[in-house]
């Protein structure tokens, strides 16, 4: 497997797109071939590398150019307050990144908030997307079976409002199914990321007041997505309900759904080997 590090793949680019003027986006890049852009979730301290470090090497070895993008207002990208729903604004930033790097089309891989971003991108810029891979994405609106917001989302907002190591630990315990995977190294790395950019936390809460989670619902437009779509879900996801996967499957024309048992909200990390195999096989298919 290709040996990669965060520091050796770290890059910045300025984007200019609606709502972004000379805005610094941080990303990690490795490999050659068709471009795969991986989009992280929306928890405090999230970033491209921490979300996808178990996936980037196998995708590079499979012959892809992989970009792990830090969304606006996360990790090393510039701070921002958003007046519109975050998935749509983030989708514009993805387009801005692609324009700045001269990328005509890319496959998108999105987890949680990153999945909402990918859905919005597929709707707004269909000519710029190859295939779509989603892991427990936000954006499908109300649930038929689970009260919303779910337990994990409540803990996520609690951590944003009251950042502490204990609140982080509580969120991660709900985040993952297998509690043995929760190490001090994992928690400390995420905690350090949270502390590096306190402005990001404040801005997220302000943005959530301007455009609450209810505005993220793109159900009415899912039928516009023509990209081949691979949806994955953790059976034990306590952040985004499993029935959202069925809603996506029913509404996206060319979609398939895979459910991981004994899996929480982070399928690409908790079941990395199986996820990598399934996702790469999907990309390779005609």
Swiss-Prot record:
Residues at the active site: 265 (proton acceptor)
Superkingdom per UniProt: Bacteria
InterPro entries, per the entry: AB_hydrolase_1 (IPR000073), AB_hydrolase_fold (IPR029058), AB_hydrolase_sf (IPR050266), Epox_hydrolase-like (IPR000639), HOPD_hydrolase_BphD (IPR017727)
Site, Transition state stabilizer: residue positions: 112
GO cellular-component term (any): membrane
Pfam families recorded: Abhydrolase_1
Pathway named in the protein's UniProt entry: Xenobiotic degradation; biphenyl degradation; 2-hydroxy-2,4-pentadienoate and benzoate from biphenyl: step 4/4
Biological process according to GO: acylglycerol catabolic process; biphenyl catabolic process
GO MF entry, a single one: monoacylglycerol lipase activity
E.C. code: 3.7.1.8
Summary of the function given for this chain in its UniProt record: Catalyzes an unusual C-C bond hydrolysis of 2-hydroxy-6-oxo-6-phenylhexa-2,4-dienoic acid (HOPDA) to produce benzoic acid and 2-hydroxy-2,4-pentadienoic acid (HPD).
Subunit structure: Homodimer.
Protein name, per record: 2-hydroxy-6-oxo-6-phenylhexa-2,4-dienoate hydrolase
